[in-house]
Amino acid sequence: MSVAFRRDSDEEHLEPKFEIPIPAGPNMVTQRGLALIQAKVAELEAALPLIEDEAHIVATKRDLRYWRARQATAQLAPAADGDIVEFGCSVRFRRNGKEQLVTLVGHDEAEPASGLISFSAPLSQALMRAEVGDFIAFGGQEDAIEILAITATDRS
């Protein structure tokens, strides 16, 4: 029989399942970020025994491996003093005439729509080590960002 008429198994046509990629570099976290990771591990561990669908079990185990790795490698950042822009600080700045407020956090805690941006994001990298009153380059423009305020966030 021609191979054109051979029925392949359904398994051959499934998308491969890969591990969730772990961001490169250190796993810096705020106290809030560490609590979020711990809560996610606890949630997945509690859910796993209750799952009956094999595909869902496989996906949950994959997620659990990711979050356990993130928990094991988490490095709680030292408290910032708010004098300069550092990991964990909130920064109010003006760019293109518009004021914005962002907080520099770990990869797993980042929610850009809520103003929580990863410390490795280009904007975070541009802001790092700046002081109030500084003008910094960003997006190929000199003096694109003016630092208006820096606040150390609570790490307790």
Regions found by a protein language model. Name each.
Residues 148-156:
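Short, compositionally biased
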